[in-house]
């Protein structure tokens, strides 16, 4: 945390270590280089993931738009992180003091970095901190948007697919950013305090779980009604498609929700433990774990998303160098199936989403 005497304002920066020159030598340099390479790899994985689910369209455009923006928000955080690194390792100094600062949040005036007035370096640090807070809270609230979009799809079952309804993602994305920008500013300027600042993490996680379970129950009942052979199923073609899409989307979202909630809750829990001093002996280890959960979590999220659908998985695995060659030279397959059946099932699985959309579009011509 830093404070400016000229304005008497205190800023809570999402940075634990500042001005530590020990990171400029030895093992820490290799660790820093490794982290930067991991960030580059994470960016490649995000781009590949977004390209894959936009190329192989398995779900409604509104859901694709919101998922793409949700994942691409990571680039905001990593740009801020790369700007902060020189301050963390002491290459750029924002004061004349040479000692390192180790703190996250505190109400002890002696542990706060006090500066006479804002400078260009300190302003850059504050802006970077704001971007990281914005990314963190957008991630917390963004996962809820995917559930709300499925609520719209569930309620508007009659004609959701044949009308674009771009106002839904626009409204959800705009309202989310208005909330997160405002809340990020309050957290940055330390107006919320520590516990109020971290409370959305757990409150929103509970809300996401309740929303998911409610939508899942409704759509599971509709899917069972559609697939059953008994009377009472009078869905139109578009409604049948929407029921199937909702059910497939929620099956995909189940693992994704679990992974995202873990990616949100674990750093928040570690942050609370660090602030209250519950883990002083392993502080540095948990700092790196917490930061990696924040900046590297798209690797787990994207992999979970891509492995949820066979068509996406096949495209995603092409990112592995030599994957095509390994696949073509494989000599045996565990529990092989007849070739004709395998081909037929693979084609159906690969084109299932595309086939639904084509049939739906043809029915409305």
Swiss-Prot record:
Subcellular location: Membrane
Major subcellular site: membrane
A Gene Ontology BP annotation from the UniProt entry: sensory perception of chemical stimulus
GO cellular component: membrane
Keywords associated with the record: Membrane, Transmembrane, Transmembrane helix
InterPro entries: 7TM_GPCR_serpentine_rcpt_Sre, Nematode_rcpt-like
Family: Belongs to the nematode receptor-like protein sre family.
Protein name: Serpentine receptor class epsilon-38
Organism: Caenorhabditis elegans
Gene it is expressed from: sre-38
């Amino acid at each position: 945390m830093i404070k400016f005497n000229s304005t008497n304002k205190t800023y809570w920066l999402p940075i634990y270590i500042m001005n530590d020159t020990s990171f400029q030598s030895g093992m820490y340099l290799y660790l820093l280089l490794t982290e930067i390479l991991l960030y580059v790899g994470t960016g490649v994985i995000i781009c590949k993931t977004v390209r894959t689910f936009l190329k192989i369209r398995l779900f409604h455009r509104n859901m694709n738009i919101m998922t793409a923006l949700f994942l691409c928000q990571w680039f905001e955080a990593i740009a801020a992180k790369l700007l902060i690194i020189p301050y963390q390792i002491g290459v750029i100094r924002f004061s004349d003091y040479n000692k390192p600062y180790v703190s996250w949040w505190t109400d002890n005036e002696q542990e706060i970095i006090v500066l006479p007035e804002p400078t260009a370096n300190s302003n850059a640090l504050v802006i970077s901190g704001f971007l990281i807070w914005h990314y963190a809270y957008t991630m917390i609230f963004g996962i809820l948007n995917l559930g709300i979009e499925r609520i719209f799809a569930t309620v508007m079952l009659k004609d959701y697919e044949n009308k674009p309804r771009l106002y839904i993602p626009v409204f959800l994305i705009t309202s989310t950013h208005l909330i997160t920008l405002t809340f990020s500013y309050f957290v940055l300027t330390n107006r919320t305090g520590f516990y109020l600042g971290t409370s959305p993490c757990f409150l929103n996680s509970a809300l996401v779980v309740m929303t998911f379970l409610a939508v899942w129950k409704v759509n599971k009942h509709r899917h069972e009604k559609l697939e059953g052979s008994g009377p009472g199923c009078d869905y139109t073609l578009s409604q049948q498609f929407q029921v199937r899409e909702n059910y497939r989307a929620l099956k995909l979202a189940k693992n994704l929700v679990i992974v995202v909630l873990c990616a949100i809750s674990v750093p928040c829990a570690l942050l609370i433990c660090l602030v209250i001093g519950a883990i002083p002996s392993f502080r540095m280890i948990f700092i790196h774990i917490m930061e990696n959960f924040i900046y590297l979590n798209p690797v787990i999220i994207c992999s979970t998303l891509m492995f949820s659908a066979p068509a996406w998985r096949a495209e995603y695995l092409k990112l592995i160098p030599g994957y095509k060659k390994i696949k073509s030279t494989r000599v045996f397959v565990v529990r092989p199936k007849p070739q004709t059946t395998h081909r037929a099932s693979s084609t159906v699985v690969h084109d299932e989403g595309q086939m639904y959309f084509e049939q739906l579009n043809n029915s409305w011509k």
